[in-house]
Amino acid sequence: MKVAIIGAGIVGSTAAYYLSKEAQIDVTVYDHGVGQATKAAAGIISPWFSKRRNKAWYRLARLGADFYQELVEDLAKDGIKTDFYQQTGVYLLKKKEEKLDELYQLALSRREESPLIGDLAILTKE
């Protein structure tokens, strides 16, 4: 079977990687650029603070972010360099403290289903 994948961003590259593991599948990736960042998110994977009301979008974004760890582990097992990935923290800045509190509570509730969020804290000037 031949499969054509349009775009070598995170979704296209991941699909190509897993499909290419199947001997009966011949994968070709088409992309107009080489060595550039994704146009979707500039490499930032952090859907947990999104206030979008579309639950299907959030679920897809959350599961994708959670899956990233598995992808990196699979790549490493196959001897593929994974130095492109580094899990770091996120700083959110808000002019109004109540907005920051809202996001903090949102992240706390979402951390139950997605522990990858990690530690949460509100930093003050002190």
Regions found by a protein language model. Name each.
Residues I5, A40, L63:
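Conserved active-site and cofactor/substrate-binding residues in soluble primary-metabolism enzymes
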Residues G7, D31, K94:
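Short beta-strand/turn micro-motifs composed of small residues
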